[in-house]
């Protein structure tokens, strides 16, 4: 069962779903909550290694370069580029609440994928959601910290 906006607000009031900062009314849909893009990105620098070795988790960190986008400036996602980002909001789920992250259709229609595979947030999860951003399109796209980037259902 997916919670309605009324149920989501009730669960927030009860503390079963905790989101900070508090959300303005326009971020609530009929059965979802919109989260905004944060200012922190991790850019993959593929030229540092011949391949990614999944058995070497430290090696993955070694090929990423953190970038913080200044307020009011865009992060330009190039065609076929893949980066990691985080949401502006911090989410905490009770031990009996599951969250699902979905990209916004307005972004999907221009080729922006918000998550590749990791859309499930287990009960008890806490933190800022990591976004797996990819531009499948043929043109660069300017993404602005603070813009609505994804929706959560519970």
Predicted segments — roles?
Residues 1-154:
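DUTPase catalytic domain/fold
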